[in-house]
């Protein structure tokens, strides 16, 4: 437990991730040895952090965390070992996935204290993430989806139905640009 979500959110896990023992060449060599014919790397997940030197997402693995281009490392190793290389992107659902970060405790000593999902760039003054806007990561400048307080609702809204708050055009354009950015890396 890292503390209350009003004081410690996903953004605060990022600097703890250093990947100092990550060795893509050794791993891909092993995958090849046991029969792999292709290698797919995760470019981003619902956490909305890009694992390459992204032009459209400042919250990326080159600017923070391991300070490495994770995708470039995987790609170089895959090509060296003769494997087809692909990238999987999942940031499209960060929009609804992070809605819990907009909440607050409904009981207990921190009742009503908002979690960190509504923080802005201005809130970073003097913090490790100064100059970065948490909204670029959390994407929570929107109303909660219908039934958002029901932790299971997100799974019923996966296909953008059943009352999910739909992403803005700005969010969709950013996801589109990030997708093209990763396609054009090589």
Question: Residues of each region from the PLM?
Answer:
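Mature catalytic domains of secreted/periplasmic carbohydrate-active enzymes
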Residues: 1-186
């Amino acid at each position: 437990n890292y503390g209350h979500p009003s004081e410690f959110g996903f953004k605060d896990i990022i600097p703890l991730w250093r990947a100092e023992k990550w060795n893509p060449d050794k791993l891909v060599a092993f995958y090849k040895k046991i029969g792999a014919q292709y290698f797919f790397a995760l470019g981003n997940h619902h956490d909305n952090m890009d694992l390459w030197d992204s032009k459209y997402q400042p919250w990326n693995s080159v600017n923070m965390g391991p300070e490495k281009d994770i995708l470039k490392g995987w790609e170089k190793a895959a090509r060296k070992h003769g494997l087809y290389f692909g990238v999987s992107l999942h940031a499209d659902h960060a929009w609804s996935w992070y809605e819990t970060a907009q909440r607050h405790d409904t009981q207990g000593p921190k009742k009503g204290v908002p979690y960190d999902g509504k923080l802005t760039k201005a809130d970073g003054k003097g913090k490790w993430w100064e100059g970065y806007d948490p909204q670029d990561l959390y994407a929570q400048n929107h109303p909660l989806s219908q039934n958002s307080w029901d932790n299971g609702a997100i799974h019923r809204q996966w296909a953008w139905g059943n009352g999910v708050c739909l992403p803005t055009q700005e969010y969709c354009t950013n996801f589109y640009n990030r997708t093209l950015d990763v396609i054009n890396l090589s």
